Amino acid sequence: MSEDTYKTIAVPSEGIYTEKRSKFIAIALPVRTVEEVKAHLETYQKKYYDARHVCYAYMLGHERKDFRANDNGEPSGTAGKPILGQINSNELTDILIIVVRYFGGIKLGTSGLIVAYKAAAAEAIAAATVIEKTVDETVTFLFEYRFMNDVMRVVKEEEPEIQEQSYDM
C-alpha cells in the first residue's frame, strides 16, 4: 500500500463471538465523517437497547489520525482499545466497528473481555470486503490557450479523472 492509497471496507459486515454464554455482535461500517459515526451509534444503540454494553472504535481519514475508542461502561481499556487494535492490525480507515454485548451471566474478567471484544471485531473484519482506495484531490487548472498542448500532454501521461472541462475564449 502506497502513500496515495488506503484500505477500508466496501459495505457493512457482521461478526458474532460467544464466550461463556455472553454474546458479542460486531458490526463493521464504512464511514467518512464523525457525523456519520454519531448517526450509526445512535441507530445501533436504539436497535440494541436491551444490550448490556454497546462499545465501539473508529478510524477516519487516509492519514489515520482521527480515531476514538469507547468502552461504554466496561472496565477501562477492555473493549474500545481491542476493537481499535483490530482496525490498526488490518491497517483500515474510514471504518466504525460497534460491538454489542449481551451478558450471559458469567463474568469474563479483564483478560476475557479483551479477548472477546478483539475476537468479535476480528470476525466482523473477516466477513468484510476490504478494498484499497486512492486518495483523491480536486485540482483546478486555469491557463492560456497557448499552453494547451503542454497541459494536454501531462493529462495524457498522468491519466487523471477529469470531472469537468470548460473553455472560455
What are these regions (language model features)?
Residues 48-51, 158-163:
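A common structural junction motif
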Residues 27, 54-56, 94-98, 138:
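Structural motif
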Residues 1-77:
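C-terminal regulatory domains involved in ligand/effector binding and gene-expression control
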Residues 164-169:
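Non-DNA-binding regulatory cores of transcription-related proteins
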Residues 37-40, 117, 150-154:
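Hydrophobic side chains in well-ordered alpha-helices
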Residues 79-126:
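Active-site beta-strand/loop microenvironment that shapes enzyme catalytic pockets
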Residues 142-161:
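Short amphipathic alpha-helix segments
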Residues 130-147:
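Short glycine-/aliphatic-rich beta-strand segments at the starts of folded cytosolic domains
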